[in-house]
Amino acid sequence: MWLGLSAGICLHAGQMAGGLATVLICDDEPSLRELIRVSLIGPYRFAEADDGEQSLALARQLRPEVMILDMMMPRRSGLEVLAEIRQDEALSNTAVIVLTAQPGTREEALRQGADLVMVKPFEPEQITAAVEGVLAERR
């Protein structure tokens, strides 16, 4: 069951117990958000946003351990959201994995403070390895 917080933002009701790492999935494509969510193996709490403004608002509200952030979204690009996240002291420990379809944007995302950049398309097991890797680095 999914609980809507507002348009395009939801939390998985079965995973709201404390102690789980929160993964915020930010992408304007619902099918990709679902693919990421079902691909992640492990006990995670999920939240989703479908544009840059919602991504930033939900990050500030939930303070996720990991953000999976698409580069190209409406209402704010992934780079704009990433810049805001990196300037927000309350979110300084959030690991950010940037998704892009344009390999040439990798360097810019890393300069802006991304922990990892993944080029689309990717295999489902790659997203699990990426999330586990950035979480291990933060611990």
Describe every region a protein language model picked out.
Residues 30-47:
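Two-component/phosphorelay signaling modules centered on CheY-like receiver
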Residues 51-54, 65, 77-83:
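Acidic catalytic/metal-coordinating carboxylates
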Residues 63-65, 90-95:
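His-Asp phosphorelay/catalytic-motif detector in bacterial-type signaling
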Residues 70:
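Active-site residues of response regulator receiver
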Residues 74-75, 92:
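The feature encodes the CheY-like receiver
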Residues 80, 102-118, 129:
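Alpha4 helix (beta4-alpha4-beta5 surface) of REC/receiver domains from two-component response regulators
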Residues 97-99:
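Hydrophobic/aromatic residues positioned on beta-strands within the core alpha/beta folds
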Residues 122-133:
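C-terminal output helix
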